[in-house]
């Protein structure tokens, strides 16, 4: 829970993240909270702890298994491919501020829903690009 007395601090952090990201040419991307489980099995690895033990996965009424996103990178990569952005001028630079979900053993200061700010850069393998993303 983020109660009213803490919301201003959260908004400040989010605003700062957005401003810095925009300054370095990153565009905000939004993508679904639920994704097909195959995305994470392929992207994260089907033998990883995240896929094997930590994801919330459900069978959709239409049949396929869907998962609450445990992280952001796989969803961004899927969005780029499905929306035909691979042929755009490189590098592609995106950022996101999202809720993620992991079925981890609850610990002090850690919950199963957490907030993640991330940057992703596709189409460049230079150390300078890595530094920009960081």
Segment roles from a protein language model:
Residues 1-134:
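TRNA-recognition modules of translation machinery and tRNA-sensing kinases, especially anticodon-binding
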């Amino acid at each position: 829970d983020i109660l009213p007395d803490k919301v201003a601090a959260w908004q400040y952090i989010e605003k700062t993240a957005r401003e810095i990201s925009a300054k370095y040419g990153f565009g905000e991307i939004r993508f679904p909270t639920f994704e097909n489980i195959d995305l994470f099995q392929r992207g994260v690895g089907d033998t990883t702890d995240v896929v094997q033990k930590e994801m919330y996965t459900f069978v959709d009424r239409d049949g396929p298994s869907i998962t609450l996103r445990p992280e952001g990178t796989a969803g961004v990569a899927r969005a780029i491919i499905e929306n035909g952005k691979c042929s755009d001028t490189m590098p592609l630079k995106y950022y996101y501020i999202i809720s993620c979900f992991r079925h981890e053993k609850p610990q002090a200061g850690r919950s199963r829903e957490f907030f993640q700010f991330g940057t992703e850069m596709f189409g460049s393998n230079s150390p300078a690009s890595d530094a920009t993303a960081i």
